[in-house]
Amino acid sequence: MGKPIVAIVGRPNVGKSTLFNKLAGKRISIVQDTPGVTRDRVYAEAEWLNYNFTMIDTGGIEPTNDDIIMKQMRRQANIAIETADVIVFIVDGKEGLTAADQEVANMLRKSKKPVVLVVNKIDSLKYEENSWEFYNLGIGDPITISASQALGLGDMLDKVVEHFDRFDADAEDDEYIRIAMIGKPNVGKSSLINKLLGEERLIVSDVAGTTRDAIDSYLETEQGKFILIDTAGLRRKSKVKEEIERYSVIRTYASIEKADVCILMIDAQDGVTEQDEKIIGYAHELNKAIMVLVNKWDLVEKDDKTMEKFKKDLQGSLKFMPYAEYLFISALTGQRTHKILELAKKCYNNYNKRVSTGILNDVISQAILMKEPPIVSLKRMKIYYATQVATKPPKFVFFVNDASASHFSYERYLENQLRNSFDFKGTGIQIEYRQRKE
């Protein structure tokens, strides 16, 4: 299961972006932040009190017309309800309670999702009593903050992480392999999911999320137990294309975060697009197991070398993830679709693989004998031993004399040795150097 997702929701100009940027400004321990598909930063990886979580800013465009504001607020609330594990609902302590706040609070209350009510712009104690009227929203005790001055953020985050125990305890689905089918619209994701569900007779259930758009399908096959995570985009039309794109990014990111295996589906006639690269880039950065499905292969004119050439071109476009598995299919005709779950299971097994310390160090010792680390800044890194410290993805720690003497080319060499020895096809692996005195 991925990290808990925390979504920030609120009216325009209440301080959503200020709060998000303050939290992403390394005033709490931000592990990593990555730009989204749009120019706006959509999410950031964060840590508080040893809890790792993902923040999502539902912000987007800030309208001025009251009717448009209300429509946008509903969309924000829906996307937060659909994707988040905890919702931070931010209101304006200086402006006071509004009808828009009331309506969104009603939506959040009905969703049964944990909500942390935050009253912003309480810049001094004299404004503290401004928070009292927000008790009327009926979604718990308001927490007062000043996002711009970073006041009260610790109390807010304490309240947020209180809800994570419930999230961590919900492990009933741990025996299932979570698969996110990702890709641009109209590439055939829905057709493929329907085919997989239609061909498998042991479907356990279809569990609908909090909105009609979020449906995860549970199925059992000879290969194992799987959850197919729906990554459908917004189906309603909107004049504001940028806003729709932002919500689509949030949906896709949330699906990837929750997945073990991410399957990028591309159109054989289009090849890899910039949008494809950005979408699968999320999965790569989050170190998920990755497969690439080339759909509509039945429509391509080909000879016995076409597939090999096509795959080579794809690997050139996606060279940042050379470990990915590839499969050429037709969701329409069913060509090779029976191999998808089998390959997904293989990727998952490698993603979850553990190597014994003894065998690992035999491989590393042999690798060092064949090629010793280079000299960097007049120093040569000495590797004492290595151990695997995690799975999903496999993470290896190398204890060395001087971590600053490491070189990326040698790290790549070590990674290749690990891959050749232990078959980590379909998953990223992580390498970390830790300094140890001789």
Swiss-Prot record:
GO terms for biological process: ribosome biogenesis. Signal peptide: none annotated. It comes from the Bacteria. GTP 1 binds at residues 10-17, 57-61, 120-123. Residues 4-168, 177-352 form the EngA-type G domain. GTP 2 binds at residues 183-190, 230-234, 295-298. Belongs to the TRAFAC class TrmE-Era-EngA-EngB-Septin-like GTPase superfamily. EngA (Der) GTPase family. GTPase that plays an essential role in the late steps of ribosome biogenesis. This is GTPase Der. It comes from Clostridium botulinum (strain Alaska E43 / Type E3).
